[in-house]
Amino acid sequence: MAPVKRPIAACFMLVLFSFGQLLSAQEKSGPCPQPIVTNDSRFRPGQVWQYTTRSHEKASTLTILKVESLPKQGVIIHIRVDKVRLRNCTGGPEPDKFQHMPFTRKVIERSVTKLVQENGVPEFKDGYDEWRKACGGVYTITVAEAINVGEETFRKNLGCPSTD
C-alpha cells in the first residue's frame, strides 16, 4: 500500500499548484518577498478550528500552522485541513487531508466557526518550502471552496468525469 501512496501524494501536490487562478499571487518580477512571521490576536499556530465545511465533511477541521505577512497580501494564515474526502473514480486511494494551504486572514476569519483545541503544530515543512520555492499565491476563496477546487483538479488529473 505504501508504494501507491507516494505517487498519489505527488499527484496531490501538483493539484495544489494547478489552480493558481484562485490565488492572489506573490510578485514574481524579482525574488520572492520574504514573509515575516507575525503575531495575530486571534489565530495562533497549533489551534484546531471547526470551519464551514462541505456538506459531507462535517468532522473536518483545520489547524493553524503559521501566521505571516507579505507586503501585498497582508496577513497569511497557513493551515492544514484534515478529514476531507477527495473522491477517486479509479478505485485508488482517496486523499483525506491537505497538508499545507495558505489563505488570507480575511478568508480564514470568514471560514472558521469554533476553536476546538490547541495542539502542537504538525509537520508542514515540505509543503511550505514548495510554496516558497514557487513564489506561491494565497487563497482568496473560502476553505470549503478551495477544497472543492482541489477535488475537481485531483479528479480531472485522474481522468474522472466532472462532478458538476
Q: Can you annotate each of these PLM segments?
A:
Residues 10-20:
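Bacterial N-terminal signal peptides
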Residues 26-87:
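N-terminal secretory signal peptides
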Residues 21-25:
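Sec/Tat signal peptide C-region and signal peptidase I cleavage site
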Residues 1-12:
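Bacterial N-terminal signal peptides that target proteins for export
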Residues 7-9, 35, 116:
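Hydrophobic alpha-helical segments and their boundary regions
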Residues 86-164:
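Beta-strand-rich cores of mature extracytoplasmic or soluble domains
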